[in-house]
Design a protein with these regions (language model features):
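Condensing-enzyme catalytic core mediating Claisen C-C bond formation in acyl metabolism
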Residues: 1-56, 159-218
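Structured loop/turn residues at beta-strand edges in well-structured enzyme cores
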Residues: 3, 79, 138-141
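Acidic, glycine-rich active-site loops and adjacent beta-strand->loop/helix elements
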Residues: 14-17, 87-93, 119-122, 147-153, ...
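Conserved catalytic cysteine-centered active-site region
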Residues: 38-44, 48-60, 89-143
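Short amphipathic alpha-helical face segments that pack within enzyme cores
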Residues: 61-66, 126-130, 165, 169
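Phosphate/pyrophosphate-binding loops at sites that engage ATP/ADP/AMP, CoA/4′-phosphopantetheine
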Residues: 66-82
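Flexible, glycine-rich active-site loops centered on histidine and acidic residues
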Residues: 136-170
């Protein structure tokens, strides 16, 4: 499907990554393969390093950390945006939605449209399209689009095929109406025929008994 949106623009983009960094060479000992074969895979795939959370850091922690930074630095006001979209495949809980968790933890206004989208690889594009559609509403001036995942807990460190691909992190894009902005074109297609290749268990990141601590992302 082809999309075209006019009078929309990205006002800013922030990324949030954990400080904990691991290299493929450091993790090779976990893989049940001869080092020579793993090194060949590293060369073919271009594996180098990835960022992983420590402790019980969850998706909402990364989102809260990033938004709080924007507030504290004066780059975004708490009341500047009217919709919050969180795109994630690793929500804190089955319910409530992670977007509502973020809204509550930051004490954002109640008149804020909160929406979760369960998407992975196409998540930024899907979230962007949804943000553009929301901006059709007169009441919505800006949208905060958060793409975040903490997937390292869902993949075994011994899985040589998947673990090197996994990283934890978040991005926050601020999208707004802008008169005279060039047309933004997008194309999106879906194929769920091989869904079994991406199936994951239904575990959530944070149990009901766990209360999020004041945000300290490392």
């Amino acid at each position: 499907m082809n999309f075209a949106f006019s009078q929309r623009r990205f006002a800013g983009l922030l990324t949030v990554v954990p400080s904990n960094e691991r290299t493929f060479l450091e993790e090779m000992a976990n893989f049940n393969f001869p080092p020579a074969r793993s090194l060949k895979l590293k060369e073919v795939m271009g594996y180098d390093r990835h960022r992983l959370v420590l402790g019980d850091v969850c998706s909402s922690d990364l989102a809260v950390h990033g938004l709080q930074y924007l507030f504290d630095s004066g780059r975004l006001g708490r009341d500047d945006f009217d919709a919050l979209i969180v795109v994630t495949q690793s929500p804190d809980y089955l319910m409530p939605p992670t977007s509502s968790v973020v809204q509550g933890r930051l004490g954002l206004k109640h008149d804020l449209f909160c929406l979760d989208i369960a998407q992975g690889c196409a998540g930024f594009l899907v979230g962007m399209i949804q943000a553009f559609l929301l901006l059709e509403q007169e009441a919505i001036r800006k949208v905060a689009l958060v793409n975040v995942d903490v997937l390292s807990r869902k993949v075994s460190p011994r899985d040589r095929n998947s673990y090197p691909l996994i990283g934890d992190g978040a991005s926050i894009a601020v999208i707004e109406r802008s008169v005279g902005a060039p047309v933004i074109h997008a194309n999106l297609k879906m194929d769920g025929a091989r869904r079994e290749a991406l199936l994951a268990d239904g575990r959530v990141a944070r149990e009901r008994s766990q209360r999020p601590e004041p945000c300290r992302v490392q």
